[in-house]
Regions:
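Active-site histidine-anchored catalytic micro-motif
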Residues: 74-141
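Active-site flanking residues adjacent to catalytic metal/cofactor-binding acidic residues
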Residues: 19, 99, 178, 184
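Short, hydrophobic/glycine-enriched beta-strand segments
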Residues: 13-22, 72-75, 95-98
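Active-site glycine-rich loop that binds ribose-phosphate moieties when present
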Residues: 112-122, 141-142, 156-171
Length: 184
């Protein structure tokens, strides 16, 4: 076979990184893959729900040698703010898609302390590469509480928008990507 006819596999194997704060992944069969990178965060202080200065420094040191690209399992919702540290490493424009019941766009309760409730707002306020945020599944009540001024950057698909009557949603009925037919 000539070199011109050979296809080169251009897939890149991005790392799968598990950030273990609570031990929750100890009970998950999928996490036992020896190719996954485990970061043991159980010894860190100042990281649960809120991330203080020491916690921020420790976490940034911990992820410094890993690329932002990849899949990052970041424990419970108390640690979603870690997404900010990963996106801070991106050097090209990006859109952030968040699947959560909460928009995580509250002003910080304490002066400049990142929290599980403020990290999306912090990314929008400080990361010039973040061009758009799409939040899927947030409650209508919490969306109404989002501070004004983010309408051009944030798109919400609320839990109400996503609700549907049984039997009226679109389903893919064929597993083949070439022959996907939609049924109602």
């Amino acid at each position: 076979m000539s070199g011109q006819n050979q296809k080169t596999d251009k897939r890149i194997a991005w790392p799968i990184i598990i950030m273990n704060f609570t031990g929750v992944y100890d009970y998950e069969a999928f996490a036992r893959n020896n190719k996954f990178i485990w970061l043991d965060c159980r010894h860190l202080y100042g990281t649960e729900g809120y991330c203080d200065r020491d916690g921020t420094l420790a976490l940034k040191r911990m992820i410094a040698d890993y690329p932002a690209e990849g899949v990052h399992f970041i424990d419970s919702g108390n640690y979603h703010y870690l997404t900010k540290f990963w996106t801070d490493k991106l050097e090209t424009p990006f859109s952030l898609i968040v699947f959560d019941h909460h928009p995580d766009m509250q002003p910080p309760l304490f002066d400049n302390i990142l929290s599980c409730g403020s990290w999306v707002k912090d990314i929008l306020d400080h990361n010039n590469n973040c061009k758009k945020v799409i939040i899927v599944g947030a409650s209508d009540k919490l969306i109404q509480a989002v501070p004004k001024g983010y309408e051009r950057q944030v798109r919400f698909y609320s839990e109400t928008t996503l609700m549907h009557e049984e039997g009226c949603c679109l389903l893919y009925t064929s597993p083949s990507p070439r022959d996907r037919s939609l049924s109602r």
